[in-house]
Amino acid sequence: MNKPVDKTPVVSVTQTGTLELMNAANAYWPAAHRDAKLMADLALAAHTIAGLEAVRLPFGLTGEAASMGCRVNYHEDKNDFTPTVECGFPSYDNLPVPSPNEGLMGTIMDAVGLCRERVGCDVPIIVGVTGPFTLAGHIRGVNDILTDVILDPDLVNKILETTWRISANFAGALVKKGVDVIAFIEPTASIIGPDFFKAYALPYLKKAAASIRAPTVLHICGDSLPIMEMMVETGVSGISIDQKVSAIAAKSAIRGRCSLVGNIDPVAVLQMKGDQGVEEECIRLLSEGVSVLAPGCGISPYTRTSQIAAMVKARDKYFEHRI
């Protein structure tokens, strides 16, 4: 990553499932969250039908927690909800470290294999891996972990010593399975502030990223500018920014040390605006120097396929005019 290219790639490092693509692939949530074939079919649709230049899976952040034994709510009566973790553990002394081939992580691994069979070696596969601090929040509960960083730092570090290994083990196994890019997704780390990020998120993200023999991306929701320097310090190959972040400011903060991924607003622009609005936003971001054109967060299930395809068309138009 961060090397000269003929055209800026158009991908998503966050979730890509939409209702239109579910219909087209005959692969619907919630089944596609936990069935390898349906997961692969839906993930592939964002590439083969919508035109994104990579295949990205899964569609939620529950693979690691579910494989550890946490209860997951799949919202069985809804096909527009991503799953949520609803319970953790009564004790944190001997947390399980599941094999990447077990449980929902194993399902994701199987889906990766199916995707690779379908696209060959020419199309990148991106897999989202839950970041260590976010996984700690799944295990402990988000409200509790936010209190613990103040009142019980030893407990937080004890949990993180397990979660970073789970994230890293899973990511490493995915790379061996044929995944090209690992996207560490750390939404919970966005709400702890720079000081706590430095103490609790940064050290474990660094260890996880250093263990991966493939390009890595770190996505953190919200205004990540106050922690941008530390995001670079994690050692990832690319930083994915939320739509709330100025691409110009982020590029200035990164100073060429890694790639900048982003950051089309997935709702206000990608879902709600027409082709012209999407085109204008994409061209603005390309002119501001993003390395990879992508949504600033997970694609809304209500996004039309034509709007996703408009990202690629806008990129092509931008580079045609530069020749």
What function would you assign to each model-found segment?
Residues 33-34, 59, 221:
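Active-site nucleophile and cofactor-binding loops and adjacent substrate-binding regions
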Residues 43-71:
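Glycine-rich, N-terminal phosphate-binding loop and its surrounding beta-alpha-beta segment
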Residues 61-64, 79, 132-134:
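A short acidic, glycine/proline-enriched capping/turn motif at secondary-structure boundaries
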Residues 71-85, 137-146:
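Short, flexible, mixed-charge acidic loops at enzyme active sites
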